[in-house]
UniProtKB/Swiss-Prot annotation:
PANTHER family assigned: ORNITHINE CARBAMOYLTRANSFERASE, CATABOLIC, ORNITHINE CARBAMOYLTRANSFERASE, MITOCHONDRIAL
Subcellular location: Cytoplasm
GO terms classed as biological process: arginine biosynthetic process via ornithine; arginine catabolic process to ornithine; citrulline biosynthetic process
Species name: Lactococcus lactis subsp. cremoris (strain MG1363)
Gene name per UniProt: arcB
Recorded catalytic activity of this chain's protein: carbamoyl phosphate + L-ornithine = L-citrulline + phosphate + H(+)
Family as reported in the entry's similarity comment: Belongs to the aspartate/ornithine carbamoyltransferase superfamily. OTCase family.
Keyword Cytoplasm annotated: yes
Protein name as catalogued: Ornithine carbamoyltransferase, catabolic
């Protein structure tokens, strides 16, 4: 008597096979689960406990933008999980130039078990997910930065032990992908996110509408304001990002607008939490806090500034958590990869979390 053929087993997981393209694609409980899973995997790593959930898997890493943290995090995370990562840069494949995104997605989806994409267009990463047939992870687009969010809120939870009710203040260009992702993710998780920026650099109405919709359920109080004192009052986390991106031509206008919003020790004191152990500083990096880089020297030469979005004093202070945050990129990305590709038993996630 011959045995019946074994068909593909059903995997009882709320994450298996899903793509992470934007935070709002997941529920607040699912985002929180990934945060906690990242903390768990970090503990396993620290104790040298193997966790090869992706043994035999092949991962395509597609980069249209240069990267230090995202590339290093995806590479080491994949290897720790037992997978093989393959880096394909802008000179290796040219989505939409020599081959359409759809055609590229179909080819890569037939060879790889999952795809990471760091680029510009949100539609492009969505099309990769639509046509590849495998999980796609957004390593950054002009609109959203979801993998960074898991790392960021891991870092917050590590430092405070909880999320709900905390206040995170992002100071800088409120229109960029980091501001978008922070205010939406914070509103999902019950964190009050304030965007402190000039009026012309506030998040779009569409982004604020998404944040406010989640805030109705979580109790968070998202805010966009140009008033620094109002915005930073009561902050537990002061967060910053670069003011300008490489290749932009409008540095001068942006620098003039944002110079009053540089994060200083005086700004930290405005929070009211600088002396009680309830305040940290975070930055997704790279940071222009001195003149030790070519761009730092160029900024000094053009604008007479030795510091940009944050002073060197704050960057090197007892409040600084940016390198802990950077390390957490690896652990959080590992959580995303394992949850969506590792055939893990995750039939449900707790709806209640703190």
């Amino acid at each position: 008597m011959t045995s019946p053929l074994i068909t593909k087993a059903e995997v009882n997981s709320v994450f298996q096979g899903r793509s992470l393209l934007a935070e709002k694609d997941f529920t607040p409980a699912e985002i929180n689960y990934l945060v906690d899973f990242g903390l768990h995997l970090k503990a396993l790593k620290q104790q040298n406990i193997p966790h090869h959930y992706l043994e035999g898997k092949n991962i395509a890493l597609l980069f249209a933008k240069t990267s230090t943290r995202t590339r290093a995090a995806f590479t080491t995370a994949a290897i720790d999980l037992g997978a093989h990562p393959e880096y394909l840069g802008a000179n290796d494949i040219q989505l939409g130039i020599k081959e359409s995104t759809e055609d590229t997605a179909r080819v890569l989806g037939s060879m790889f078990d999952a795809i990471e994409r760091r680029g510009f267009s949100q539609k492009e990463v969505e099309d990769l997910a639509k046509y590849s047939g495998v999980p796609v992870w957004n390593g950054l687009t002009d609109d959203w930065h979801p993998t960074q969010m898991i790392a960021d809120f891991m870092t917050v939870k590590e430092n405070f032990g909880y999320l709900k009710g905390l206040t995170l203040v992002y100071v800088g260009d409120g229109r960029n992908n980091m501001a978008n992702s922070l205010i939406v993710t914070g509103s999902m998780l019950g964190v009050n996110v304030h965007i402190v920026a000039p009026d012309s650099l506030h998040p779009s109405k569409e982004v604020m509408d998404i944040a406010n919709k989640f805030a109705e359920k979580s109790g968070a109080k998202p805010l966009a304001t140009s008033n620094i004192e109002e915005g930073v009052k009561g902050a537990n986390i002061i967060y910053s990002d670069v003011w300008v991106s490489m290749g932009e031509s409008n540095w001068e206008e942006r620098v003039k607008l944002l110079t009053p919003y540089r994060i200083t020790m005086d700004m930290l004191k405005m929070t009211g939490n600088a002396d009680n152990g309830k305040l940290i500083f975070m930055h997704c990096l790279p940071a222009f806090h001195d003149t030790e880089t070519e761009y730092g020297k160029e900024i000094k030469e053009k604008y007479g500034l030795t510091e940009m979005e944050v002073t060197d004093e704050v960057f090197r202070s007892k409040y600084a958590r940016q390198f802990e945050e950077a390390e957490n990129r690896m652990h959080s990305i590992k959580a995303i990869m394992a949850a969506t590709l590792g055939n893990l038993f995750i039939p449900a996630v707790p709806e209640d979390f703190k």
